[in-house]
Swiss-Prot record:
SUPFAM superfamilies: Bacterial exopeptidase dimerisation domain, Zn-dependent exopeptidases. Gene3D superfamilies: 3.30.70.360, Zn peptidases. InterPro entries: ArgE/DapE_CS, Bact_exopeptidase_dim_dom, DapE_proteobac, Peptidase_M20, Peptidase_M20_dimer, Peptidase_M20A. Binds 2 Zn(2+) or Co(2+) ions per subunit. Catalyzes the hydrolysis of N-succinyl-L,L-diaminopimelic acid (SDAP), forming succinate and LL-2,6-diaminopimelate (DAP), an intermediate involved in the bacterial biosynthesis of lysine and meso-diaminopimelic acid, an essential component of bacterial cell walls. Keywords: Amino-acid biosynthesis, Cobalt, Diaminopimelate biosynthesis, Hydrolase, Lysine biosynthesis, Metal-binding, Zinc. Pathway: Amino-acid biosynthesis; L-lysine biosynthesis via DAP pathway; LL-2,6-diaminopimelate from (S)-tetrahydrodipicolinate (succinylase route): step 3/3. One of its GO terms (biological process) is diaminopimelate biosynthetic process. Belongs to the peptidase M20A family. DapE subfamily. This is Succinyl-diaminopimelate desuccinylase. Homodimer. The active site is at D76, E140 (proton acceptor). It comes from Bartonella quintana (strain Toulouse).
């Protein structure tokens, strides 16, 4: 059993569990053992969905009446890749020259270890005048179907309500406390399949080449910016991710080609208005069908969870900002940049902010965190918890 007030020992214990999504691999069991010793009531619901693996989750709660602070995170990690590329084994938690190495050190077992250690330090001195809960999933790096979104609904059905939430994702950039996330852009993905008619290149009149139409559709999607950004968000961006024709032959006109794209969108749009805009752009392309009624296109939207949001709870943001400044001297930047996170689900239940370790090495070979950063984040979390319940 690691020392509860030592985030390094806690982090090493978690890293030594190879919990690549969707496998628990002992990570939640280790956390359950630690939290139970601290006085938490721990539950381990398992969720499933069609065509997905069952996923274990953890919900732990302590305290009585009053304000309720949720800490949210995940113990699942991305695959380490080629083991021979790592300086140290990715699931051993080796410390060398002031850094702790391991998959999940930054994203985001480090944040969990720091929060637990911070709370343990407080409990050595005083009790919490309120409630603290940890909402931890094993399905954040994967489809995110059997994790936080279902865990929140499960907890709500049991009567849980939260005053605010802190997500321990690695939001800092260069140093602990330089950036906190107060919102996130939405994500929308689609697939455009352009149907043609296969044929010999020497007889184009007998075929229908989908590629020229695909080029026009791509131009319609990308030639005009979606927007110029807003006060809190950078401009929305549409990125083509694949163009697949699957035709290695140089003398064959292909039967079809597929265009996949993703849009990260700001608060100019809702998911519905953005879908309408994309459909309008595609429809602006004139189809020139031959006698076979080809080519033509089909648009399919890929189901997505969560949408763009901004947290406007000034008290929550200020409490966190003041804690950061008092410990580090940094006045954090309020940001909405980057990818999505499980905060997109939590915002439907309570105000949420995100703050954690510097994320330069997340998902990389030799993912690591400095020992100084771990101690600093623990101190900030400790100050934030105390101030939250003051």
């Amino acid at each position: 059993m690691p020392v509860l007030t030592d985030p390094l020992q806690l982090l090493q214990a978690l890293i030594r569990c190879p919990s690549v999504t969707p496998y628990e691999a002992g990570a939640l069991s280790t956390l359950e053992q630690i939290l139970t010793k601290m006085g938490f009531n721990v539950k381990r619901p398992v969720f499933t969905d069609k065509n997905t693996e069952d996923v274990e989750n953890l919900y732990a709660k302590m305290g009585g009446e009053g304000r309720h602070l949720m800490f949210a995170g995940h113990t699942d990690v991305v695959p380490p890749g080629a083991l021979e590329d790592w300086t140290y084994p990715p699931f051993e938690g080796v410390i060398d020259q002031g850094k702790l190495y391991g998959r999940g050190a930054v994203d985001m077992k480090g944040g969990i270890a720091c929060f637990v250690a911070a709370l343990a330090r407080i409990l050595e001195k005083r009790s919490i005048k309120g409630m603290v809960s940890l909402l931890i999933t094993g399905d954040e790096e994967g489809p995110a179907l059997n994790g936080t979104v279902k865990l929140l609904k499960w907890a709500e059905q049991k009567g849980e309500k939260w005053t605010a939430a802190l997500v321990g994702e690695p939001t800092s950039v260069k140093t602990v406390g330089d950036v906190i996330k107060i919102g996130r852009r939405g994500s929308l993905s689609g697939v455009v399949t352009v149907k043609g008619r296969q044929g010999h290149v020497a007889f184009p009149e007998r075929a229908a080449n989908p590629l020229p139409l695909a080029g026009k559709l791509i131009q319609a999607l990308t030639q005009t910016a979606l927007d110029r950004g807003t006060e809190n968000f950078q401009p929305s961006n549409l990125e083509l991710t694949t163009i697949d024709t699957d035709n290695p032959a140089v003398n064959v006109i292909p039967a079809q080609t597929t265009i996949r794209f993703n849009i990260r969108y700001n608060d100019v749009w809702t998911k519905e208005t953005l879908m309408t805009e994309i459909e309008k752009r595609l429809a602006s392309v004139q189809l020139k069908n031959n006698d076979y009624q080809y080519p033509y296109y089909q648009l399919e939207w890929i189901p997505s969870l969560g949408s763009v949001f901004i947290t406007k709870n000034d008290k929550l943001i200020k409490t966190l900002s003041n804690a950061i400044e008092s410990v580090t001297g940094n006045i954090p930047e309020y940001s909405t940049s980057g990818g999505t996170s499980d905060a997109r689900f939590i915002k439907d239940y309570c105000p949420v902010v995100e703050f954690g370790l510097p994320g330069q090495t997340m998902h990389m070979v030799d993912e690591c965190v400095t020992l100084d950063a771990i101690e600093t984040l623990t101190s900030v979390y400790e100050r934030f918890i105390v101030d939250f319940f003051a």
